[in-house]
């Protein structure tokens, strides 16, 4: 897996990050809830027209991302347990598409002409040619993207991507099969 630094500027993004939970909470509040996790998804979908009138379109589509992403996370977990790499990559890609289209955390709304993460995602998809998968990483808004690159394409991918995103922007990561562990100091 590569992490690609797309050289986005995070210095003025506090309002963009804060808008995501605020808008999701506005949808929850319409139903008398504090958080979307307290709301059954089917109730949300049955009341879309009313929710749009009382919140905003962006709040509604961000709430949709919340509901679908939680289901997708369970499916991704199952795919990993079953070592189904193809299904994992498909779900990973769908998650990325949902972030782009519904969560809308790829570029700041006040700067539509500067989209370094969008360009990096476009380039990654093109370079992968239908293999592997890519998506925004972390909280989004242009910092880094994650890219699963087949081993036989890794060097070429990095070379071509760095022509677009800059020298030393591609970082190859290794993922341990054991997950997080606690390191303890030997007390002698």
Predicted regions and their residues:
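N-terminal pre-core extensions flanking Radical SAM catalytic domains
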Residues: 142-145
């Amino acid at each position: 897996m590569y992490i690609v630094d797309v050289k986005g500027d995070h210095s003025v993004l506090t309002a963009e990050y804060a808008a995501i939970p605020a808008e999701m909470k506005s949808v929850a509040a319409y139903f008398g809830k504090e958080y979307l996790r307290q709301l059954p998804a089917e109730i949300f979908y049955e009341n879309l027209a009313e929710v749009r009138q009382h919140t905003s379109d962006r709040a509604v589509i961000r709430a949709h991302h919340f509901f679908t992403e939680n289901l997708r996370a369970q499916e991704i977990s199952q795919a990993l347990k079953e070592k189904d790499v193809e299904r994992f990559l498909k779900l990973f890609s769908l998650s990325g598409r949902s972030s782009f289209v519904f969560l809308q955390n790829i570029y700041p709304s006040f700067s539509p002409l500067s989209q370094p993460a969008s360009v990096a995602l476009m380039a990654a998809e093109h370079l992968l040619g239908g293999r592997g998968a890519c998506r925004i990483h972390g909280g989004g808004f242009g910092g880094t993207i994650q890219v699963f690159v087949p081993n036989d394409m890794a060097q070429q991918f990095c070379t071509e991507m760095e022509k677009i995103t800059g020298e030393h922007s591609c970082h190859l990561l290794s993922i341990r099969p054991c997950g997080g562990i606690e390191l303890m100091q030997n007390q002698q």
